[in-house]
Amino acid sequence: MIKISPSILACDFARMGEEIAKVDKFSDYLHVDVMDGLFVPNISFGMPVIKSIRKTTDIFFDVHLMIERPERYIEEFAALGSDLITIHYESTENPAEVLKQIRALGKKAGISVKPGTDYSVLLPLLPLCDLVLVMTVEPGFGGQKFMHDMMPKVSALREDVKAGGYDI
């Protein structure tokens, strides 16, 4: 199943409301990259921005947390209207517990891996996931060149998801 989820990281920040309105009718999700400058070398949006844009649209919010120790903020991001919260495997000591925390709040849970991380670390987590994101760029900046050598990882993971009968 294909879902369209444009990233607001690519929008004109001075016209964020207008930019969101342009894609709202034609998109399934709105992808919101949250970066803390620690887990990745860039800073993007925080909770106040999500709170503000949530008031402008009822589109499904796909919030991608590229932050250290995301478990500290899951409740707040859920309360602000995130529908799906994706964490990075590498960002926390216990990704399974964070995924359970997200689901316990009634939200969909996603897991992501950086290009250098072996996808097999995700296999025990698949029963806890609604989405798996294999990064095909180094996280932290938009507009990077696609890493074609990540496609075998995507294909292998797809086969494992299918073989396990997971609805991801």
Residue ranges of model-derived segments:
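Predominantly soluble domains enriched in secretory-pathway, periplasmic, or organellar proteins
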Residues: L99-Q101, T117
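Short beta->alpha connector loops at strand-helix junctions that form conserved
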Residues: H88-E90, M135-E138
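Conserved Lys-Pro-Asp/Glu-containing loop-to-beta segment of HAD-superfamily phosphomonoesterases
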Residues: D167-I168
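Carboxylate-rich, divalent-cation-coordinating active-site regions
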Residues: V132
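Conserved N-terminal beta1-alpha1 strand-loop-helix module at the mouth
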Residues: M1-T86, T92-N94, Q101-A104, K108-A109, ...
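A short, flexible beta-alpha/helix-coil linker loop
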Residues: D36-G37, V137-F141
